[in-house]
Amino acid sequence: MASTNTWRACTRIGLSAVLGLGLIASTAVPLNAAETPLRGQDPDLRTSQQHTQQQVLSPSMLKAQGTIPVYVKFKGQGAYEQTQPRAVLQNRQAPVNAQAQVQAIKTRVESQAQSVAGESHAKVLYTTHNVMPGVALMGDAQAIRDLASRPDVERISPIVPKYRQNAGSVVDTGAAENWARQNTGYTGKGIKIAVIDSGIDYTHADFGGPGTKEAFDEATKLTNMPEASSGLYDPAKFLGGYDLAGDDYNGLNTAVPDNNPIDCISGGHGTHVAGTAAGWGVDAQGKTFRGDYSTLTPEKLGEMKIGPGSAPDAQLYSFRVFGCSGATNLVGQALDKVLDPNGDGDFSDRAQVVNMSLGGEFSPEDDPESYAVETLFRQGVLAVVSAGNATGYNGVGDTYSDSGQPANAISALTVANSVGSTYAMDAAQILAPSQIAGKIPGDYSVDYNYSKASEETLRGQVVAAPASNKFGCEAFSAEDAAKLKDRWVFIEWANEDGTISCGSKVRFDNAEKAGAKGVVLSSQEERAELGIAGNETIPGFRVAKSASDKVRETAQAGTLEIRLGEDLKGGLRVQSGKFDELTTSSARGFHGSYGYTKPDLAAPGNNISSAAVGTGTGSIQYTGTSMSAPFASGVAAQVLQAHQDYSPIQIKAAMMNSADHDLHDAAGHTYAVDRVGSGRIDAKAAVDTRVLLYNADRPEQVSQT
């Protein structure tokens, strides 16, 4: 919590000089056990070779075994630093065109890559040349370790597989106030954000696309980006990118890349993330919002089908690194493309902010993607990374170093997940009885594709399951099935003590086998932290606690009729009652032993409503630090628009210095910096601040430990 931070305290009394904290950090590198020298071998020579190898091999590589993905960094700088003057790196000048030189560097790196691959009998996954020169290999760990003796090799590190980190926010954080500034609102205009994720559904209305399912279906058949004149996307919003993975890629098999980075229908993570950062917004009529953002009051925002992203005028690149499921080893390749998205050797189209809502738990400090993040920071690009969501501790993220890499990269702006004052909830519409007709809050089952269902499929009469099988965990008898046929079944979700007798899929399958059209579940929570899966063949809705009693009574009476629909998903905005609480699953980062702590700040990430892939105009709610990071990416774009000569150091400092809203748990206890960073983000204050304080010895980390 920020009130204990030396640098924040100084901000409050108006210091205008950079604070030199003189922090010294040291990292211990484990050494191999001593071995007996070979007969006749010069021991001094052998000692020198061991020392060289230990400098080149990362700590994790020293112990690695078997066939693994590895990044081999070659000596020297990447093409960007080799060809661009210092003023460009400091964001004081536009990049110079050095295409011929960049192409020569690329050719040299590709030649080196083939050489090391042949020497180690490994397969080339990809090469990098813009950020730093190197190659990703898949091969035997020992054979790749032997490359450490090559004079052109600087560092060898295992690649750690990365996973996806699964409208009120713009009001809570002051982002909407920045849209309404006099003369010029700060909406991210002129700033390019690269989203490294599962792709973007650029046909969605939130990004200016046609907003139809037919347009999405047409776009998914292409292996190249459609022409700008095709009408399938808005070139003012979406600038293109690459699919580095292919639908079937899962991190273990071979990627099948192409030039069309559209999201997968069974994915949607990247689409949601992109909308949170820079979606135009979708109005109540399902049209792309093309109006004046400065006129959007909280009331008008609440009426929109999808609220704008935090930087609605920013432009987007998509670098797809995930298939439709599974992990990825391709993040380093995507980071290399951030500096030259179209690959022509001209860096004038580079992104200034890169969002990564991905990572891995407890990954080592020597992850090569973290090196790339640090290098990009030096080259003028800020990486905004989700802190991560705990998966191995019953959803509780209060475990040191849980967040892993690249969230623990020193220069990254690492974002924890806080609760906003309001959140979006799905709605169902009660059609009968008339005395309780209207919308009720809850959440839709996840595995069913509502966008392709007919209106008739998503409505019907609801009857209660028999008391003897009220949880639906057992198969329904023939007698019960006769009562459920062609109706929806109301099932109790949990026991009175909150325990759950079986999972949702079992219940949905039992209901389907009995001939039911859909499932309605009760709930003992107003907003559940975790969703319900259901199954792929019948729809389902879990009713919030506040509406469960009346739904139960009318279902038992046989008078309840209900409707679901894409137009109702995310259709309610309710008060959370938990403003500025930290979400319990938000992962804790490093504790300071390495000379710094993580995360850096927090942003709203609970029940965030954003664009849903393949729906045209629909929305979906996700919770996690994956949703917090893109909101912060949009704020970074606002700050850079307001201060166009800011370097990543200054952007990060402005955002951390101004994030002075304390976060607390459900009991009101305030969190310390090693769980939430400096505090909850404040977009308006980040733009307004003129006093930037950061660690003079290590400015990339901003704060002291």
Where are these regions (language model features)?
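Short acidic, glycine-rich surface-loop motifs adjacent to enzyme active sites
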Residues: 338-365, 386-387, 486-496
